[in-house]
């Protein structure tokens, strides 16, 4: 199971994620309680081993602006939330970066078609709410062997069952490993990765 831990903002949380076996880490570079500056993300990259993707997360920024900010942070992956188009994915790829395109289960089915993204992230209808949802509903999309991440309401207690229900290739977590909004609990980070990979 591929595991991405998102919304990291401290050296300790990055190390807890990668040392417990996370396959990717995410830095929020958009307005959020988890937002960090590009300079801070660059500082945290020192603690991310080679081969572990570090992803810059963006919500409403234009794809070209996201590329500039990600480059400033030293990142090679961009995660795009919000209303997007295939041209946004192309813009990021043309810059030599890889793309995670985030969509919600409340969105029109056409958005689940491939736009050439490297990974698809499927979230709850209200991203960032931390609320659980009907994970099994993803199966009707017929994603097959496509590489995609399940997100929304996941935590160490439910990630195993949720991933099985959705037949997920990977999982993504942020609020489900926090002691308070925007503050990662290192024990929960470790427990989540362990549970997802069990």
Language-model segments: residues:
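Conserved N-terminal beta1-alpha1 strand-loop-helix module at the mouth
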Residues: 1-198
